[in-house]
A protein has these predicted regions:
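His/Glu-based metal-binding/catalytic segments typifying zinc-dependent metallopeptidases
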Residues: 122-178, 184
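Charge-rich, well-structured scaffold segments of protease-associated domains
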Residues: 1-121, 138, 188
Length: 188
């Protein structure tokens, strides 16, 4: 349809010819800094940040995914352009298309979308996660509810047991209030 074609063309422009406007970057940086500052007062965010640092140490997984106030304030347009050039590449793109389209149409659309992207065969592998020593951390906070995290990195995502273990973890405790563990603790 015409709307679908227009949407695809618009998406190609956004993906293939991004506009790294300094004014927008500055506005979004201020918004992110405010969100990070607010999160630093919230017990769940504090616990999550400390937990990730505890189990991953200096590995990139140990860094807060939202960044830090300092890291956000240091981002320049040149950093965005470099990141785009290195990582928005055809040979690493996963394009997901959902809707009223056949597989042949979806493949054609995906090829069209990715055809304007460069290829980069020099993407660094993610470092191996090193096991950390057993530790217990307690954080004093005036919250009315405790946040308890426990865990250890045990396998890579490409391990054949990863997905079954992920589902089991989700059912037992990883899904928050929908988990069996939470049900046992809160309801019984």
């Amino acid at each position: 349809s015409e709307e679908k074609s227009e949407a695809i063309e618009l998406f190609k422009i956004v993906l293939q010819k991004p506009n790294f406007d300094k004014e927008i970057l500055d506005r979004e940086a201020k918004r992110y800094v405010a969100n990070i500052a607010q999160a630093e007062t919230m017990p769940e965010a504090i616990a999550t940040k400390r937990f990730m640092k505890s189990i991953y140490g200096e590995h990139p997984y140990g860094l807060p995914s939202s960044g830090t106030i300092d890291s956000i304030n240091r981002i320049k347009v040149s950093h965005l352009k470099k990141f785009y050039k290195e990582f928005y590449v055809a040979n690493q793109a996963d394009i997901v298309i959902v809707g009223d389209v056949t597989q042949a149409e979806a493949e054609s659309i995906a090829k069209d979308i990715s055809s304007g992207l460069p290829v980069n065969n020099n993407i660094k592998a993610i470092p191996v996660v090193k096991q950390v020593e057993k530790q217990e951390t307690r954080i004093s906070h005036p919250a009315k509810q405790a946040h308890l995290y426990y865990g250890v990195p045990i396998m890579k995502r490409n391990d054949p047991d990863f997905f079954p273990l992920y589902v089991g973890n989700h059912v037992l405790g990883g899904s928050g209030f929908g988990s069996r563990l939470t049900h046992e603790i809160r309801e019984k």
